[in-house]
Amino acid sequence: MSNKAILCVDDERTVLLGLRDQIAKHFGDRYRYETAESVDEAWEVIEELSEDGIENFIIVSDWLMPGVRGDEFLIQIHQQFPKIVTVMLTGHVDEAAIERVRRSANLHAYLAKPWSEDHLISVIRSGLRRFDDENSNPVHR
């Protein structure tokens, strides 16, 4: 099993399955794919991934969800797991939220709904390259 995972978080099941299916179609069985319909469920999945020894993963999270918004969630993620690559997805452009996540959560990319499959795959590919770059260029102390 891969030591890398891609977690998609969105309260709309059709969006969630569309994301997962498009990503899995392009990357096959090289990665573990997870979905969550809420921030609470996402935290459970993250805990499960950590227990399985998976530390390199990408989170694609919707911005507007019930309870905790995606920008707040990604900031919390970055505070606890700074190496996780974060991508925010939204149909409602909130430039202030995007900028806040860029500054506070090292946002890798922002995708507008509806997204193009090519752009989604390009964003995921570049996020995965960040893991490869970190592993091939270790910091010497």
Each model region followed by its residue ranges:
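The C-terminal output helix
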Residues: R125-H140
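Conserved acidic segment of CheY-like receiver
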Residues: N3-I23, I59, L120
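C-terminal output helix
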Residues: W115-S126
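Acidic, metal-coordinating helix/loop segments flanking the phosphotransfer/catalytic sites
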Residues: T35-I58
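Alpha4 helix (beta4-alpha4-beta5 surface) of REC/receiver domains from two-component response regulators
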Residues: E72, V93-Y110
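Hydrophobic/aromatic residues positioned on beta-strands within the core alpha/beta folds
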Residues: L89-T90
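Receiver (REC) domain active-site loop signature in two-component systems and cognate sites
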Residues: M65
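Short amphipathic alpha-helix used as the core "switch/output" element in two-component signaling
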Residues: E44, D71-K83
